[in-house]
């Protein structure tokens, strides 16, 4: 993250918006676990490193570039499957747990930044199911009107981010602005 901080320091204006879009569900060699017997340590570590640890380290890296007297938004893509209260299907252990961990990190961050940066907003956003490599193997179960292009999803999320106020900081929201249970 040092090179990331160095690049930000070259930007001479205060940060106003950072959007984290990193995420990992599967690769050619790693599949989401359907049952307990599929869990292995390296898959858990990879999911947590990208989905939970990276977003909070990004926040840590940018904190020194935020001014308390200016509005600032930090938005991070999470996933509905990271909701403990909304888990009806089970499976996908590492992905679900890593997104739930991201949600906790960012909810906690929103409380700290409310004190340090009263005009800041931390947004935890579910973009919906997008027609990308991440969701491609699982799209057959998604209704056509709920499978978004990346551009559609971006429009929905930018609308949410642009309409939020500091009092909205720390909420877990879906692409349609509905609140997702923790």
Which residues are covered by each model-predicted region?
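Hydrophobic structural elements of the Rossmann-like NAD(P)H-binding subdomain
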Residues: 19, 75, 122-125, 135
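Conserved hydrophobic beta-strands of the Rossmann-like cofactor-binding core
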Residues: 14, 18-19, 23
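C-terminal helical subdomain
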Residues: 124, 132, 136-182
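Conserved Rossmann-fold SDR core element
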Residues: 103, 113-130, 168-172
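Catalytic loop of short-chain dehydrogenase/reductase
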Residues: 24-28, 32-53, 63, 67-116
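Short-chain dehydrogenase/reductase
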Residues: 5, 59, 106, 154-157
